[in-house]
A protein has these predicted regions:
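C-terminal region of N-terminal signal peptides and the immediate post-cleavage residues
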Residues: 10-32
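Generic secondary-structure transition motif, activating predominantly at the C-termini of alpha-helices
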Residues: 58, 278, 321-325
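N-terminal export and membrane-targeting signals
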Residues: 1-5
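Active-site-adjacent alpha-helix of alpha/beta-hydrolase-fold enzymes
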Residues: 271-279
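A recurrent domain-boundary module in secreted/ectodomain proteins
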Residues: 6-14, 299, 304-325
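Chitinase-like catalytic core of GlcNAc-active glycosidases
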Residues: 27-250, 255-272, 289-295, 305-316
Length: 325
């Protein structure tokens, strides 16, 4: 279906709503991923952690975000090239590894952005360019969808239109995630939160990065510091009470202390936060007014840092996510 979506390019954004509406009538809700997921970012680069081929990623992960697509000279357009340092003999070898992971029930998405890259979607032309190029890459490599990790500002109106067009091209099997920073999700008026709400009908999960962050307000109006169970639970509560479904909210954390500048928590603290939100147990000082048994799960930066530490993070958090209600 992705290939057909590229043919819509000239009228991608304009056609998105109409096509998407037809899709939703014919197809059930997305079932491309389990009810609770462990998500990890995979490095298409060597940063001194561990170089991994995709096939070497721990089987605990349900969603793997390939990091990263890059911008081109055309505003909004994205591209992807394998880093030679990974040692792939061919692009086909990488495509075969994606297919093998998918055969195991794992979704592989292409992440757009990161701290180093600037992808700008702020008008109809750039929204069209984003959607057309994203659909092309999904078709070329066999990705299940797109992860939005834009860290230099977004325009919710046009990014929403771009993702609606991607959804129209792929259909309801699209896996669509995002990883905003904490400041991006403090309230529903922020552009990132608006993007999530605008596209909630086909949004798989928001994995806010609860690290590399200063202190932030929780949903109770109190100030919480990063690196604590309360930071995870009280901030996730903002999204849970702000219009997203529990199945669309996940906790993003570093896999090891080296994986982030600040905000690392022990994997058992991640499990406690999941329990607090899903079951009302193992909370810190913040206790949510209700439980959210449908909570999506957890995300980590990154599968490579996790592997560098013997997969201790995924071996601890993965089974716990699987055991959520």
């Amino acid at each position: 279906a992705a290939g057909a979506g590229v043919l819509l390019a000239a009228g991608l954004v304009g056609a998105a709503s109409a096509v998407g509406a037809g899709d939703s009538e014919e197809a059930p809700a997305p079932t491309a991923v389990p009810a609770h997921t462990l998500t990890g970012y995979w490095h298409n680069f060597d940063n001194g952690s561990t170089v991994l081929k995709l096939g070497e990623v721990s089987s605990q992960y349900d969603i793997i975000a390939v990091s990263f697509a890059s911008s081109t000279a055309t505003p909004g357009q994205i591209d992807f090239e394998l880093d030679p340092v990974l040692g792939y003999g061919s692009e086909q070898e990488f495509r075969d590894e994606i297919a093998a992971k998918q055969a195991e029930g794992v979704a592989v998405v292409l992440s757009v952005g990161g701290a180093e890259d600037h992808v700008t979607v702020n008008d109809e032309a750039s929204a069209n360019a984003f959607a057309e190029s994203a659909l092309g890459l999904i078709d070329e490599f066999g990705f299940d969808g797109i992860d939005i990790d834009l860290e230099h500002g977004i325009n919710a109106t046009y990014m929403s239109r771009a993702m609606e067009a991607v959804h129209a091209g792929v259909g309801d099997d699209l896996v669509y995630t995002m990883a905003p920073q904490t400041l991006d999700m403090q309230n529903t008026t922020s552009e990132y939160f608006q993007l999530a709400l605008n596209t909630k009908d086909f949004l798989t999960a928001v994995h806010t990065q609860y690290y590399n962050s200063g202190s932030m307000l929780g949903c109770d109006g109190q100030v919480y510091s990063a690196g604590t169970v309360d930071f995870l639970t009280a901030l996730a509560c903002i999204q849970l009470e702000g219009g997203l479904d529990a199945s669309q909210v996940g906790l993003g954390v570093p896999a090891t202390p080296n994986a982030a500048g600040s905000g690392y928590v022990d994997p058992q603290v991640v499990n406690d936060a999941l329990d607090c939100l899903a079951r009302g147990t193992n909370c810190g000082s913040f206790v949510p007014d209700q439980t959210y048994p449908g909570l999506r799960g957890a995300m980590t930066w990154s599968v490579n840092w996790d592997a560098h530490a013997g997969n201790a993070w995924s071996d601890t958090v993965g089974p716990h996510v699987d055991g959520l209600p």
